[in-house]
Amino acid sequence: MIACLSPNGQNLNGGDAAPTRLLVATLRGINLLERSEPGAAWTDRGRVLDGHHCGSIMVEPKRGGIFAGMHSGGLYFSGDGGFTWEKRGEGITIGQVFSVGYAHHGDKVALYAGTEPASMFRSDDYGKSWVEQPGVKETTGRDKWSFPSPPHQAHVKTMTIDPRDPNVIYAGVEQGDLLKTIDGGARWRVLDDYSKPADWTYRDIHLVV
């Protein structure tokens, strides 16, 4: 099993056993660690994508691909467990990818990438090409979304797909709102039952599970 860790953004791991490979996202790339079996000592296998600020890593279990979202670097793909990478972001017109997710539609795999400024992109060919889903930008209340640090732009920090229905996705905007789509990302609505009207500035959503 491969496990992923990052200082920012979202991680999706592959498998349910104790990991023997660990991908650790950093401000200067991804560090690889391996061990022969659970409980054994970890061995440093070096760093890949050196110089890239990696904020999010995902292992897609059906085909085993790994996707990494970069701050100011777009999206990268690995097909060999994280040792070599290629850029896969054609169609992603926003360079900062904060979150990545997948949905299984039978044998098909839909991939999602959340960005800054806050938007959502979808791929139906395993990351080779992407199409922006305009619904996030059309969400009511978007004008209140912001972020404390310059350039004060909100981002899609986290997302999760309903295991019962791959068209149902929840996304958290930092700082903004909790969003839901029931059509695979085309249209989104705000979920605000959990908060009070005066609390909108505190909707600093880091994780949706």
Descriptions of predicted regions:
Residues 1-209:
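Extracellular glycan-interacting surfaces
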